[in-house]
């Protein structure tokens, strides 16, 4: 009740900004009378920060050493805060079904409580993934960390309101994988700039990971190039700011006219 009451206050303005169509649908479902007030303005990515040419080799080397990555093995990265709904267990189970060689780094999992980490480690041991999957703390240089990955996974089991990590990966020319729900459905065009797995399906997630790992270099580079252009055109920080300021000006103009 309290959450809905709090959210209802947010609907009292002249306009409502939704950070994704997923959030727009949620607002419409809870407060159908304000549907005409909603404007979708997706969150944006800083294309200077998440630009491969702006990440110096020294930063990449430092992160590679910090993550203790092995040479000549594809890198799978999941970067998220230590919360079970982010899909850590789903990813571990999916990885147990992947036959291709890989190494996976769970960035952020190392910040979790001892109990949280023990649950993940127990599953890693159960599936004999000790040599393939590791838990590390949050990265102080996420750009350099992500650029080391061949695949970036966001396996959230609860739909993300948006999920900017996918766009950050795409801006760096990487291949993101996520379940087909929430904000991920708006930022990944399946097979063109990433892969979408059937919601909550471990088998589907495993298949998408295998598919991404087996891509030929030319196909991988083509997807990466498309991803960078896709983010630049549709999800840049500058675009987000321009759309937001435009809406503010519209609200001010309407207030001056109507009082």
What spans do the regions from the language model cover?
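A short, well-ordered alpha-helix in the C-terminal region of glycosyltransferases
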Residues: 74, 211, 218-234, 243-246
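Glycosyltransferase donor-sugar binding loop
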Residues: 45, 79, 103-118
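Active-site donor-binding acidic/aromatic loop of nucleotide-activated sugar
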Residues: 113-117, 130-139, 145, 195-196
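Conserved acidic donor-binding segment of nucleotide-sugar-dependent glycosyltransferases
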Residues: 190-191, 195-202, 211-217
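A short, active-site helix/loop in glycosyltransferases that binds the activated sugar's phosphate group
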Residues: 13-40, 45-49
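A short helix/loop element that forms part of the nucleotide-sugar donor recognition site in Leloir-type
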Residues: 51-69, 120-121, 218
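Short hydrophobic beta-strand element within catalytic cores of glycosyltransferases
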Residues: 175-178, 188
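A conserved mid-protein helix/loop that constitutes part of the nucleotide-sugar donor-binding site
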Residues: 74-97, 118, 238, 242
